[in-house]
Curated annotation (Swiss-Prot):
Chain's role: Cysteine protease that plays a key role in cytoplasm to vacuole transport (Cvt) and autophagy by mediating both proteolytic activation and delipidation of ATG8. Required for selective autophagic degradation of the nucleus (nucleophagy) as well as for mitophagy which contributes to regulate mitochondrial quantity and quality by eliminating the mitochondria to a basal level to fulfill cellular energy requirements and preventing excess ROS production. The protease activity is required for proteolytic activation of ATG8: cleaves the C-terminal amino acid of ATG8 to reveal a C-terminal glycine.
Top-level taxonomy: Eukaryota, Fungi, Dikarya, Ascomycota, Saccharomycotina
Quaternary assembly: Interacts with ATG8.
Enzyme Commission number, as recorded: 3.4.22.-
GO biological process: aggrephagy; autophagosome assembly; mitophagy; piecemeal microautophagy of the nucleus; protein processing; protein transport
Signal peptide (residue range): none
Record's GO cellular component terms: nucleus; phagophore assembly site
A matching Pfam family: Peptidase_C54
Native species: Kluyveromyces marxianus (strain DMKU3-1042 / BCC 29191 / NBRC 104275)
Molecular functions (GO terms): cysteine-type endopeptidase activity; protein-phosphatidylethanolamide deconjugating activity
Protein name in UniProt: Cysteine protease ATG4
Keyword Phosphoprotein: no
Outcome of gene disruption: Impairs the formation of preautophagosomal structures. Blocks the maturation and subsequent localization of ATG8 to autophagic membranes.
Keywords: Autophagy, Cytoplasm, Hydrolase, Nucleus, Protease, Protein transport, Thiol protease, Transport
Catalytic activity: [protein]-C-terminal L-amino acid-glycyl-phosphatidylethanolamide + H2O = [protein]-C-terminal L-amino acid-glycine + a 1,2-diacyl-sn-glycero-3-phosphoethanolamine
Amino acid sequence: MEFLTKITQQLGLVGEIDKVGSVFVLGEEYRPYIFKTQGKADDAETAFGSFLGNAQTNPQLLSDIETRIFFTYRTQFTPIPRDEEGPSPINLTLFFRDNPINTLENVLTDPDSFYSDIGWGCMIRTGQSLLANAIQRVKQTREFRVNLENIDIKEMSIIQWFQDDWKYPLSLHNFVKVEGKKSGMKPGQWFGPSSTARSIQSLINDFPDCGIDRCLISPQSADIYEDEMIRVFEENKRANVLLLFATRLGVNEINSIYWSDIFQILKSSYSVGIAGGKPSSSLYFFGYQNDYLFYLDPHQTQSSSLDMDDNSYYRSCHGHRFSKIHISETDPSMLLGMLISGKAEWDLFKDEFKNSRIIQFVASKPSDDIYEGVDLSPGSVSVHSIQSDLQDTGDYIDVGNFMSEKANSSQPSKNEEFENVKCKNQRILICENPSETEIEQVLVEDSTTDN
């Protein structure tokens, strides 16, 4: 059995890990392969080792990856009632991704409730994965390694907090609930990075037993307001602070100027991962090798945790099966997670990222918000007016809409130059000729909030 497990692991990973180049997993560095030259092995294992060129994936690397907690689509969970103005729980995707009998039963017995998050919950699942690994680090340290043959009681309690039912504090159900209250998000609507960050912040604030003392979010940038961090550590110099940055690092793809900064984040010991990936298809990134990002995919469908015994549920939240994607193919919208434990780490963190092109340290929150004093509560007249002018694609403004009338202009495109402008409240001045000007206001939230 042990040998078969090794075969499964090796065949699953040999195509993902290159033999050249260190692998970085949330601050840990590994040689990708080790070469067996000593010790005895049976004939089958020897033959398999020859098939791999006597190379064996580094077991310490595998153990670290296996220890990462991750969550996926689930079916037949506690129902989430549909909002009258929200999307329908019934869609064709369910018939292909779920058991058709389950789907048909739900349609016939309760067509106005969601029994699965297939097709809309992947950003929540990757946000849960990021949060779970942050909590795991607080509760069990970075050195903890999972043993799937023997459930760790402390880690099991962490995983149970995420089960799909209203009574569990970090469930998908409660992600939907708190964001619905904050922004009017409806069940079945796809979350963006900012929505996920706000949900995590609210859930942490309501659940101090998770071990994270404060969660500071930057909904549309990676700015850290130092005065806020100072206040946190004045109250508790050992505070565990989760920083969440919902940011966009390009137009259709990550601008190559930021590649090294993304690698620096995943290489950092403060990183708890990145949620993002592709438009409307979020992944959980936990490491990289060369120019490839390693990720866990939430789009595999599993049964409800409530229908599993503890052993099965525990194993379903771990595993070696991961994939990789070249950084140039990833979507620029993402949620970055960093965990700072105590004032001493904060000082080291600032020094480590002082030259980052993504993470920016700002003395205090600026007060020149172009919408300061405007009612931005869900459903307000002001919000309706703004939304009618702006197309929100996953929490981010598509600046291309503002430029659409200029697309056929003979003037050369300046989009690449605009990508590197580091301004939050922008007034874009468009000049086709000296006699015609047009000014557009673009709202980009930059506040680091702690509500």
